[in-house]
Amino acid sequence: MGMVGLRDVFLVAPAYHHQNAGVISGSDHMNSNAAAAAALGVGVIPLLTAGTPQQNVEDSDINFLGNNRRWQNNNNNHETQYLHFKSTNQTTVGTSSNNSGSGSGASGTATCQDCGNQAKKECKQRRCRTCCKSRGFDCSTHVKSTWVSAARRRERQVMPTGANPTAGSSLSTSSGTKKPRIVGSQQQQQQQATSHTSTSNTPPQSFETSSSRQDGGGSREAWPGQVRAAAVFKCVRVTAVEDGDDEYAYQAVVKIGGHVFKGFLYDQGLEPKEGFPSMSDLHLGGSANNHNGVSASAPILDPPNVVYGGGGGSGGGFYS
C-alpha cells in the first residue's frame, strides 16, 4: 500500500445550521477551520445534508412568533369571553324581565295571560276573574263581586218611589175591571129603575146617586142630589170568572156633570109582581102587542161613540 499524500485528504465539516453554538461562535469556528485547511493546503468541502428544519432562530423572530401566538390566544379568549358575556346578558335580561313582570303583577298592573285584560291582584295565576274561573283554577278571586254601578244604584233608589204609583195604578185598574162584576144590589136596583122609566115612556123615577161616586169626583155640594136622565142599555154577553159560563147583561153609560158613569146590569132572577117588570115587559124585541098599557117601540140600539146622560135634574137627553 502506497503512502497517501495530504492533497488527497478531504475533511468534511458539518453544515452551518448543525452548529449548536451561537452565530458568532460558528463563524469563528469556520474561520478557524478554513485557516487550518488553508494552512494544510487541503480543500474543505462542507457537508450538505437534508436535515431537520431550522431550529436556531433569532431572538427577534422568536419574539415575533411568540407575540403572534399570544395575540391569537388573546383573540380566542376575547371571543370566548364575549360569547360568555352575551349569554350571560341574555340570561340576565330574561331574569330581569321575569322579575319586572312579577313586580308589575304585584303592583296591580299585570295583564291577563289569556285575554289581555287587567289581572286581579290576588290571582296567583295572573289572570282575570273570568279566565281564571273558566280554566278551573283554585283562586280566591272567583267570588262574585258585590260592586254595583252608580246607574244601577240610582235605579234602585228610584224604584221604591216609582213603584207606588205603579202599584196604585195596577190596583185601580184591577179594581176597575172587577167593579162591573161586583155591583151592589142598591146600584143595580137604581139602574133598573132608570131603565124601566126610560124605556116604558113613563115619567122617569128619580134616584139618589151613590155617595161613593160623589165623594170620588169632588165635594157633595158640586153634585146634584137627584138626576133624571134617559139612558139606553146595550145587551152584551159576559163570561163569569168563577165558573166560566156565559150570561147576558146590560151596559149603560151616563154622563153627569161632565163625568162619565158606566156600569153593567146583571140578571138577578125573577122579581115579584109588585116589583120592577121583567125584560119582556120592556118590549125591546119590537113586538106589536101592547102590555100593561105600554105601546110597543122599535128596538133600541146603542149608536157608536155616543154618550147618554142628563142635566142636573132639569130633563134628559144624550150627548155625542
UniProtKB/Swiss-Prot annotation:
Residues 112-139 bind DNA. A motif (Required for homo- and heterodimerization) lies at residues 256-259. Restricted to lateral root primordia. Keywords: Activator, Auxin biosynthesis, Auxin signaling pathway, Developmental protein, DNA-binding, Metal-binding, Nucleus, Zinc. Residues 168-177 have a biased composition (Low complexity). Residues 90-110, 150-223 are annotated as: Disordered. Induction: Expression repressed by LDL1 via histone H3 and H4 deacetylation. It comes from the Eukaryota. GO terms for biological process: anther development; auxin biosynthetic process; auxin-activated signaling pathway; pollen development; response to auxin; root development. InterPro entries: SHI, SHI_C, Znf_LRP1. Disruption phenotype: No visible phenotype. Signal peptide: none annotated. Residues 193-214 have a biased composition (Polar residues). One of its GO terms (molecular function) is protein homodimerization activity. One of its GO terms (cellular component) is nucleus. It is found in: Nucleus. Zn(2+) 2 binds at C112, C128, C132, C139. Pfam families: DUF702. Transcription activator that binds DNA on 5'-ACTCTAC-3' and promotes auxin homeostasis-regulating gene expression (e.g. YUC genes), as well as genes affecting stamen development, cell expansion and timing of flowering. Synergistically with other SHI-related proteins, regulates gynoecium, stamen and leaf development in a dose-dependent manner, controlling apical-basal patterning. Promotes style and stigma formation, and influence vascular development during gynoecium development. May also have a role in the formation and/or maintenance of the shoot apical meristem (SAM). Modulates root growth. Belongs to the SHI protein family. This is Protein LATERAL ROOT PRIMORDIUM 1.
